């Protein structure tokens, strides 16, 4: 991933430049697990306003003018659409995006939907948790909640339908920025899924965790709308089926909070009066749900990533690949039961040699970005 604007976590005080109101999270100290989740649900429900779905340029349409403007990639003031943004376009004012949208209605020169016949026609309102999972457009305030309803290309949104997010084995459709539709390769679910690009997987994961926290008192009632594609599990506590929870935890870990998310969280708070706590305090994800597991069967090992020596006899290994490894900000090492046993920050800043901590003899998976490989400690 290429989030050059990732902000380094600075402990319990949250992220640099995050504007968390003083006292907003009072009462959370010492809590963990579902007790913490319930306390957060109370906090982010108090003060939350229903700003409406919107007609004309009102409701969510109005919110997007402050929550989803590009100040990070091209920095050109267009709408950030996570289904079309090309993060390789890193020169301010220069776009490699397949298409771009201006905020506002067509009558005022904007690209708000409207009808569409293909990619790039217009942007609409995408429920990252599909509204069919919780009762449709008339289920309020959730269908109007800007924290998980985002502007995206209308056509790509329609290609998603109500598929859950996931990781695709073989794409049956691919958008112009690499977003995919296809059968799931995630253990526990074999249906069709919609896979966003790596740059935004953590964003969507934290939206899902926000949803099952903000609306935890409604989750059992959402069971009446359960479909084969819905990853909600009908429980107030965990909120998500295990396969989906594990995926969201993995994405949240692999794609850390960015300045874009921090700014969006602040703007959403100004707009509707509540915050996404997992952007302000990403450590709460693990404190509530635990660590992300990675089953060995989930790893299709990359031929273009190698470790030497292998088997490993000391604690120094050299990693080579056919990509520039400096683009990867973390290396994760898992054991064969899927536990994360070591995380290495900025591993390739000074070369391709990394130091393992004292790992017991056995088989391990090393993962960086979308690349992974198996190695043995002897």
Please annotate each region the language model reported.
Residues 1-21:
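Bacterial Sec-dependent N-terminal signal peptides
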Residues 7, 299-378:
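C-terminal outer-membrane/trafficking sorting elements
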Residues 16-20, 289-302:
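Low-complexity, Pro/Thr/Ser/Gly/Ala-rich linker/spacer regions in secreted
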Residues 17-48:
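Boundary/junction segments of secreted and surface-exposed precursor proteins
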Residues 47-175:
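Betabetaalpha-Me/HNH-type nuclease active-site subdomain
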Residues 83-90, 212-217, 368-369:
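Short, flexible beta-strand-to-coil junctions
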Residues 113-125, 131-293:
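Domain-level detector of nuclease and nuclease-like folds
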């Amino acid at each position: 991933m290429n989030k050059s604007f990732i902000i380094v976590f600075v402990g319990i005080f949250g992220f640099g430049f995050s504007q968390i109101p003083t006292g907003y999270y009072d009462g959370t100290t010492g809590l963990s697990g579902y007790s913490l989740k319930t306390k957060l649900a109370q906090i982010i429900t108090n003060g939350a306003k229903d700003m409406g779905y919107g007609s004309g340029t009102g409701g969510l349409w109005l919110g997007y003018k402050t929550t989803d403007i590009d100040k990070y990639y091209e920095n050109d003031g267009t709408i950030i659409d996570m289904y079309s943004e090309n993060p390789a376009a890193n020169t301010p004012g220069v776009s490699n995006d397949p298409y771009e949208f201006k905020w506002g209605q067509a009558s005022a020169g904007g690209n708000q939907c409207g009808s569409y016949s293909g990619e790039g026609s217009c942007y609409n309102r995408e429920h990252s948790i599909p509204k069919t999972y919780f009762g449709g457009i008339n289920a309020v305030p959730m269908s109007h909640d800007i924290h998980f309803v985002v502007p995206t290309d209308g056509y790509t949104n329609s290609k998603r339908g109500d598929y859950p997010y996931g990781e695709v084995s073989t794409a049956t459709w691919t958008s112009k920025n690499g977003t995919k539709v296809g059968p799931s390769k995630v253990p526990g679910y074999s249906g069709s899924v919609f896979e966003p690009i790596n740059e935004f997987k953590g964003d969507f994961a934290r939206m899902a965790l926000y949803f099952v926290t903000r609306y935890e008192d409604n989750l059992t009632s959402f069971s009446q709308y359960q479909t084969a594609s819905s990853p909600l599990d009908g429980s107030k506590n965990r909120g998500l089926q295990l396969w989906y929870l594990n995926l969201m935890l993995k994405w949240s870990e692999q794609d850390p909070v960015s300045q874009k998310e921090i700014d969006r969280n602040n703007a959403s708070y100004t707009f509707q009066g509540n915050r996404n706590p997992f952007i302000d305090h990403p450590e709460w994800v693990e404190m509530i749900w635990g660590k992300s597991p990675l089953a060995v069967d989930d790893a299709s090992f990359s031929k273009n990533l190698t470790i030497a020596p292998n088997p490993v006899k000391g604690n120094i290994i050299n990693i080579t690949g056919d990509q520039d490894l400096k683009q990867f900000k973390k290396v994760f090492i898992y054991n064969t039961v899927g536990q994360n046993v070591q995380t290495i920050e900025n591993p390739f800043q000074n070369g391709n040699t990394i130091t393992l901590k004292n790992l017991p003899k056995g088989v391990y998976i090393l993962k960086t970005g979308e690349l992974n490989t198996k190695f043995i400690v002897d």
